[in-house]
UniProtKB/Swiss-Prot annotation:
GO terms for molecular function: homoserine O-acetyltransferase activity. The gene is metE. It comes from Emericella nidulans (strain FGSC A4 / ATCC 38163 / CBS 112.46 / NRRL 194 / M139). The lineage of its organism: Eukaryota, Fungi, Dikarya, Ascomycota, Pezizomycotina. Its EC number is 2.3.1.31. Residues 63-435 form the AB hydrolase-1 domain. GO terms for biological process: 'de novo' L-methionine biosynthetic process; homoserine metabolic process; methionine biosynthetic process; methionine metabolic process. Pathway: Amino-acid biosynthesis; L-methionine biosynthesis via de novo pathway; O-acetyl-L-homoserine from L-homoserine: step 1/1. Keywords: Acyltransferase, Amino-acid biosynthesis, Methionine biosynthesis, Transferase. This is Homoserine O-acetyltransferase.
């Protein structure tokens, strides 16, 4: 439920016709900022910022709870952190808090980005690859303009994971009189060389797609192969080796869920069988000039069926000659882990834009809380910058996180004077903060009760309730939680 406040003065729009991705988010508002100068010095005009609100702002405007989304997230908190959102007993209690989530610049989900008009002018066309570099600091500054327009005088707490954790840390520098508490989760004080390198590899996947066209592609012909490959690469950094091994091992997928990337598949019949195995999963055109000509086998059957994961996608079972006695002796060449990655890649390209992916990953690269905050000769600039954060902080980390390591969470907690570090127990890796709802919910609730007693002690409008998360009823579009059994792939 999006709640408009009577104090709002800036213009709002209900839709963004040029951007097909913004329509994926229900019940969001888009506010237009007349002018905004980025950290780089570039000035944008008529800047859209998408956001959602839930709950009621207190008369004194001091019960706002700001939630910050991750790289591919949106302003729809209910989608990716839904089990934490609700009433008493849930961390994001809308009977106590006015919950606000704002979309970051560069994202395709409503805020200014590659898929919105330049300066809001249809005659200028879309930004495309000409959308300027934005930083995490740009996000929090423009978001504050929206929060001010909503009548928010003080933020009770800011919570965010991954990229959202970066925004959470930056919010703290507005000072303790404006932001009372922060909860950075599975994030970093500055983007590491490891993360920068993964972002570069993912961008190169997009650049290598012939359909990328230097960023001047159409919505009808996007670089889907490159973006899908980037997503697969990213997903491996979001999970852990042990997570994939326990879920998939060397399982062979159910044939009915085999991912058909090209619409139809060449049957692996002699003489093209080896070629087909070699190119399995390639998203290019199967009819290359050097591909072998099909040859009719002695006997074969072709079974057409509908892939249950992709409505309307036709796939065909593989067939081999019935006279081939060695078929059962051949090793498996297609595994459940591959099937799952292809499924995730295909799902992602339907909801995200390649130029936006490039823009957001470059935004992450700029993140460094010590920039312009530490002395030039400082021996530990990050520690010096973190020491300036005055709010109480709850830092949540994941031991199995190979992307934003637990050591990085310790660095944050050790640098912030009034902090406490808690561990999310999970083998799932980085994405555990979007999967382990019970643990995240309990840690945040305990922290809020400690540092926000005036808000948490109020009798909620819905009455008392036992601590606990809501039930996950559908797979997340913008997060990682899934209701289906992914081990079936």
């Amino acid at each position: 439920m999006t709640t408009e406040q009577p104090t709002a003065r800036l213009q709002r729009v209900d839709s963004q016709p040029e951007n097909p991705f913004s329509a994926l988010i229900e019940d969001q508002s888009i506010v237009i900022i007349p002018t905004f100068t980025l950290e780089s010095g570039v000035t944008l005009y008529n800047v859209p910022v998408a956001y959602t609100t839930r709950g009621t702002l207190s008369p004194s405007g001091d019960n706002a709870l700001v939630i910050c989304h991750a790289l591919s997230g949106s302003a729809d908190v209910a989608d990716w952190w839904g089990p934490l959102l609700g009433g008493p007993g849930q961390a994001f209690d809308i009977s106590r808090f006015f919950v606000v989530c704002l979309n970051s610049l560069g994202s395709p989900y409503g805020s200014a980005s590659a898929v919105t008009y330049k300066d809001g002018n249809p005659e200028k066309g879309l930004y495309g690859p000409e959308f300027p570099l934005t930083t995490v600091r740009d996000d929090v500054r423009i978001h504050k303009m929206v929060l001010d327009d909503l009548g928010i005088k003080q933020i009770a707490a800011v919570v965010g994971g991954s990229m959202g954790g970066m925004l959470t840390l930056e919010y703290a520098y507005f000072g303790k009189d404006y932001v009372r508490a922060i909860v950075p989760i599975a994030t970093s004080a500055r983007h590491s060389a490891w993360c920068i390198s993964w972002g570069e590899a993912q961008r190169q996947s997009i650049y290598s797609d012939p359909k990328y066209e230097n960023g001047y592609y159409s919505f009808d012909e996007p670089p889907a192969a490159g973006l899908g490959a980037a997503r697969m690469s990213a997903l491996l950094t979001y999970r852990s080796r042990n997570s994939f091994e326990s879920r998939f091992g060397r399982n062979v997928p159910d044939p009915s869920k085999r991912q058909n990337i090209n619409g139809t598949e060449r049957l692996p019949t002699p003489p093209n069988e080896h070629w087909a195995i070699h190119n399995d999963g390639h998203k290019g055109n199967w009819s290359g000039r050097n591909s072998p000509a099909p040859e009719k086998p002695a006997e074969k059957t072709e079974v057409q069926y509908m892939d249950p994961q992709f409505s309307g996608t036709k796939t065909f079972s593989k067939s081999v000659s019935t006279t081939d006695g060695n078929a059962q002796k051949r090793p498996a060449t297609y595994f459940s882990a591959q099937s799952y990655l292809r499924y995730q890649g295909d799902k992602f390209v339907k909801r995200f834009d390649a130029n936006c992916y490039i823009a957001i990953t470059r935004k992450l690269d700029t993140h460094d809380v010590s920039r312009h905050r530490a002395r030039p000769d400082s021996e530990n600039p990050v520690r010096e910058a973190l020491s300036q954060i005055q709010q109480p902080a709850l830092v949540l980390g994941i031991e199995s996180d190979g992307l934003f390591t637990f050591e990085e969470q310790k660095e944050i907690a050790e640098g912030i004077p009034d902090s406490r570090l808690k561990r999310i127990d999970s083998p799932e890796g980085h994405d555990a903060f979007l999967l382990q709802f019970e643990q995240v919910n309990q840690y945040i609730l305990e922290f809020f009760r400690e540092v926000l007693p005036d808000i948490m002690s109020k009798t909620p409008t819905d009455g008392a309730a036992i601590d606990g998360v809501g039930k996950l009823t559908k797979s997340s579009t913008f997060g990682e939680a899934e209701v289906e059994d992914i081990t079936a792939w």
